[in-house]
Amino acid sequence: MTLMAGSGVADTAADLVVSPLDTLETVVVTATRTPKLLKDTPVVTRVVTSADISRSGKPDIAGLLEQQMPGVEFSLGMAQNPQINMSGFGGGGILFLLDGERMAGETLDNPDYSRLNLQNVDRVEIVKGAASSLYGSNATGGVVNIISGSPKEGTHVKLNARYGSHQLQSYGALASYRNKRIANSLDARFDSQGEIRFPRLGDFSRAFATHSWNVRDRATVTLAEDASITARAGYYWRQRNSSNVSYERYGDLSAGLSARWKELTAKYSFDTYDKYDYEVATGEQARDYRNRQNSVNVQYSHEFRDVGTFTAGGDWLDDYLMSYEFDSGSYSQTNLDAFLQWDWKAADKVWIVPGLRYDWFSASRANRVSPKLSMLWRPGKGNCSLRLNYAAGFRAPNLKELYMDFDMAGIFHIFGNPDLKSETSHNLNVSAEYLKGNRSFTVMAFHNIVDNRISYLWNESIEGLQYLNLHRLFVTGVDVSAMRSFPFGLTVNGEYIYTHEKYGKGDLRANPTRPHAVTVKADYSHLWMTDWRLTATANFKWLSAVTGDVMSLFSPEAARTQRYPAYSMLGLTLSQTFPKGFTLGVAVDNVLNYIPSYYYYNSPLTTGIGGSISLSWQM
C-alpha cells in the first residue's frame, strides 16, 4: 500500500505538479485521532485527496475506492444491495465514518453508500487492519473516514452537472463563506440512474433504477483563538424502483453539535435512518425499518512540547432498531467506551504510539479491551520509513444478529442468536517506504487472525438459517506500490496486492477475496496559459479469478461452489479548465469493452463501453 495521497497536480489552474514528497509534507491526516502530517503518522494510511476524486470521474464512494485501491471490490448481495470486500473483510468489519462520526442504518452489514456524497470532500482516509482501539466495534478490518472540505476565505459558489450512460444524471450545488468569526458550507446534490438491462444471462437480468437527494450544512463560529462551536445538519432521501408494483424508499436525518475549548472537545450526534415500502397504485408508503442513534463524545488532548501528545476520551451511544425482521418490533442497547493514547516522539526519528480502549455493550453484555502499538523509524537521511503496527479488533453482535426472526417469503426463516460471542481480531503489519524527490516505493506485509466471525449458516435443529460464530479465519498478504512524477506534468503509480484467506472447515465463502489485484494510474496535466489547464487520467485495474460458495434461495442448506472469472477494466478521464471558473470533463468507462459472459453477483455492472460528460462552474 502506498502512503502517498495521490500525486500529480491539484485542480486549480495556478498549481504546478505535486511530487510524492510534497504530498507527504502537506497532507494532514487524523488516523491516530490527533492531526499529523502523513509522513509522520506511524499508522499505515492511504489518502485519496479531493484532486484524486475530481480526476477519477467517479461520482460515488464505491466506484472511487474500487478504482483507487486494488484490494477493494464491491459486489451485490441479497436484493441487489451492495457489499464491500476490502482485503478479506466485509461490511461488518469495515467501519465507514463521515467526518469521524458513525452512520445509522445498514443492509447486510453494509451502510447505505449513496449517503456518502463526494461533492464536498477534502480527502478520504483509509486505514487497513484492526482499529478498534481508536474507533471501537466494527473496526476489525479497517476504517474509511470521509472528511468534508472546509470553506475558504470569502464567498464561493460551485455548480456542477453530469450526464452519462444509462440515463445517468447528477446535479450539485455548493455555497460556502468564511471570515474571521464565521464559516458555513452548504451543499446539495441530486443523482439519478436509469434501469440497466444486461445483455447476457446471469444471477440477475437488470440493475434497478434509482434516484436520490442529499443536502448538508455545516456552520462554525469561532469564539476565540482556542474556542469554537460547530453545528451540522443533513437530509438524505433515495428511491429504488425494484418492481412495477412497489418501490423501496430510504431516508435519513442527521444533526450534530460540537464545542472546542483549548484541548477539550465535546460532541453530540443524532442520526435516524428509515426504510419504507411505497405502493405505486395507491401512493401510500409504510415504514418498516428505523435505526436511531444518539451519541456523545468527549476527548482531551494535551501536547507536551518535543515529547508527544496524550489523548483520552470516551463515548456514549444509544442505539435503537425497529425492523420488519424482528418478531417483537424493536430493540435498543447502550454502548459505553473509554480510550487512552500516547503519541510519543521517542527520539529524533522514532515515533511510538501505544493505545488502549475499553468497550461495553448492554444487549449482549459484551465487553472488550482493545490494545494497539504503532511504531515509525526513519533511519539515515530520512528517505526511508519503517513502520510496525499491531492492533486488536473487536465487533460486538448487533441487534439484528441477536434478535432477528425473519420469514423469507415462506421459504425459510433467518434467526438471530442471543448467545453470540463478539468477533475479535489481531492485525500485524510491517511496511517499508522509500521516498526521494519525485519517486517512491512501498512494500507492506500483513497478517490478520479473526476469531468468532459472525455469519449465518443452516441450522438443522431449527430448520433455518441462524447467526452463528464461525471458525478462525486467517487473512495474510503483501502490498507493493510505486510512484514516479516527471517534470513535464506526468505522474505514474502502480499497486499490486496479494491476499490469501484460510477459512475454517465448513465455513461459507460467500464473499471471497480475489487473491491477486493490480491497479495502474497515469495522470498528466499541462497549463497552456492562465486559467487554461488540461488534465488527463488513465486508470487500469485487473482482478484475478476466485472461487466462492453460493447459497441457493430455495435450498439454503446446500451451497454450491462457483468460480468467478478474472477481469480487467480501463477508464479514461479528460478535463479542461477555462476562464471565468468553467471546467468541462469527459469520462470513458470500460474502454476495453469488457462484458461478463455471465453476470454473477460480483461481476462489474457494465454492459460495455460507456461514459459521461460533466460541466462545472465556480466563483
Task: Show the residue positions of the predicted features.
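N-terminal periplasmic accessory domains that precede
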Residues: I61-L65, Q80-N85, F96-L97, D112-N117, ...
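Gram-negative outer-membrane beta-barrel transporters
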Residues: K345-I352, F446-I449, L468-M551, L592-I595
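Surface-exposed extracellular loop regions of Gram-negative outer-membrane beta-barrel proteins
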Residues: D274, S362-S364, R368, W377-L428, ...
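N-terminal periplasmic "start-of-domain" segments of outer-membrane beta-barrel proteins
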Residues: T23-S54, Q83
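Periplasmic-side early beta-strands and strand-to-turn transitions of outer-membrane beta-barrels
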Residues: S133, N145, K152-G154, R162, ...
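Face-selective signature of the C-terminal outer-membrane beta-barrel domain
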Residues: S185, T220-W237, R249-R378, Y434, ...
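Short acidic/polar hinge/loop motifs at secondary-structure boundaries
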Residues: F74, E101-K128
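Outer-membrane beta-barrel signature, preferentially recognizing the C-terminal barrel domain
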Residues: S246-K262, D288-R292, S385, A392-V450, ...
